[in-house]
Every structure is written in C-alpha cells, then in structure tokens.
Amino acid sequence: MLFRSLAPNINSYKRFQEGSFAPTTAAWGIDNRTAGFRLAGHGGSIRIECRVPGADVNPYLAFAGLIQAGLYGIENNLELEDPLMGNIYQNKKAKSVPGTLREAINLAKKSKLLPKIFQADVLEHYIHAAEWEQSEYDKSVNDWEHQRYFERG
C-alpha cells in the first residue's frame, strides 16, 4: 500500500530501471541521486527528497503515507539504517523496490507495518483496487503481443 501510493499504476513500475535515475532500491543516501531517499543540502537548507514517485502520483496520498510511516518510526524508536554510498544500483545490501504492481500487492498483503499505519478498510480498499487493476491488465492484449505473435506470420 505505501509503495502503491508512490507508484500507483502498472506503468509506474517501468521507470525503475538501473541507471535511469529512478531509484530501484528503498535505500537512503546523502546527496546520492541513485537512492530512493536523498538527504540534500547543507545547514538550514537541508531537506529529504523522496525520489520514488513519478508524475502519476497523487501527492496527497503519497505525503500521507510517508508521514504516517515516518511518525510510526519515530514513535516506535525504529533504528535508521546507515546511509548507502556510491552507486546504489550496484549495492547488493540495498533492498529492491517492487518491480511490478503485482509484486507491490504481494508485499502489501504480507506487510506487518501497513496495518499499523493505515485503517483496515483503507488498506483493504487500496489492495482490492490494485488487484482489480492488475486483473484488467492481465486480460488485455498489448501492441507488443500483436507485433510479436500476430503480425509475425
């Protein structure tokens, strides 16, 4: 659910390609553009950039999810992992972001954190909506399939 608020559509996941400057990991770094979360600036101008969302994101939903997750971490004294340095695309310690909507759905269903930060009916609604969207996509025949299998003959 949290990741779906940052990457809401099937097409959202196609940007997460190594070397694309779209993050492929749920890591953070200091002034590191290969990180999903980047601590940037100095002194009074320091800020956190969430580099995961694309132009298709609902900013209200994304901010709500990020704020809820952050508050949960603060209230429960969760330990922040060390920042990753260098090219995070090649860092084997970094946790990968979901590569598809289907993967995001499966992670949301297994999550122990999401039920703690979202009401059950909200979480259920977003998972159901994502499953419906994935199901509709799975039934569609796209241009690649036409070109590959139909027009080839």
Residue ranges of model-derived segments:
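Acidic, glycine-enriched catalytic cores built around paired aspartates
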Residues: 88-153
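Aromatic-enriched hydrophobic runs in primary sequence
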Residues: 6, 13, 52-55, 83, ...
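C-terminal catalytic subdomain
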Residues: 7-95
